[in-house]
């Protein structure tokens, strides 16, 4: 039987939610009730699969499934009031920490003026953010399209490349094995994970994948496409593969890809949704090799962990295909005043506090600690790797990776796996993590591995 709409039920549910939003703390009974509600509503109205996916953080009790609020700049608090060091960073959105006061203040001030733009008048913050990004990004990148997510920024990049290269008879895209560029139809065509791709086949035609980090494979693909008349419009890749398991290419790889793109007349699209905004020790990961892309994709940390925003920044030559008709690719909420306020404040914090340099320093400290643990536990840990504050610990099998996330949760440190590599646990904390918290994370990892070794030996 079809369920009839119920205005009364919707009104009661929304009123209950507003009451919770107003509260700073919950008593014990309220906490238990909220946990039950959240789990039930996820099961019945969001997606029950998420409950299974988050089993590593529910191993210590279902209270762990319910996030309540930010703690300090680098911590989260659950409904029991227990504080966790955040080494997941919302998959890379909290580069300047949780509720960074500069970012929150900028958004609150803009909220008091005008939350969203009229769509007809020129909005000043969009202009100022575009100018700021033109100054901040490498090379000749000049014009920005704003959206709401990393996937959307990749979609815009693909469409820009198509619009620019189609008159030149170039329609093929080359992406890399292990890549993750999002899950909308265009971005998914560039993503290289069968689990995400197969249910939506056929995807967009014209996409080829080559091994990441293998410059000869890239050259061969570009050459073969040219020989067969399937000339390449663009090469799209991540400077470091995040969801692929924090995979670093060989030194000089990005430089070599840039040269190949120039040689074959292909555009270079760099997806820095996860590696950008100071994460790897530079403002953008491509700066480690002084590589200048034709199109750059940003999102995640651009909004300072307060507002969602993505950006696609391109050279004037490429972006000019939208000059005659700027409505060829638009989005209602892209570049809205609240999101732009957050992004401008985020950039200001990153530069004022020199957080990219801090990411390099603290990342080296953490990675040294994880590599020492890999030497102490070779039966469990295959490798520790990373750059800046984007790190990964790869285990000998999937089960140990899951157990490590669970044990770290018991040690009050939040970590999680990567989407394309189940054996790998990602370490992606805020760049504002303190030295003391870095030391706590390493101690927690040592305790977690010791507990896992005992359980393996007893099994």
UniProtKB/Swiss-Prot annotation:
CDD domains: OAT_like. It is an enzyme of class 2 (transferase). Disulfide bonds: none annotated. Pathway: Amine and polyamine degradation; putrescine degradation; 4-aminobutanal from putrescine (transaminase route): step 1/1. Pyridoxal 5'-phosphate binds at residues 150-151, 274, 332. It catalyses: an alkane-alpha,omega-diamine + 2-oxoglutarate = an omega-aminoaldehyde + L-glutamate; putrescine + 2-oxoglutarate = 1-pyrroline + L-glutamate + H2O; cadaverine + 2-oxoglutarate = 5-aminopentanal + L-glutamate. GO terms for biological process: L-lysine catabolic process; putrescine catabolic process. Transmembrane segments: none annotated. One of its GO terms (molecular function) is putrescine--2-oxoglutarate transaminase activity. Belongs to the class-III pyridoxal-phosphate-dependent aminotransferase family. Putrescine aminotransferase subfamily. This is Putrescine aminotransferase. The gene is patA.
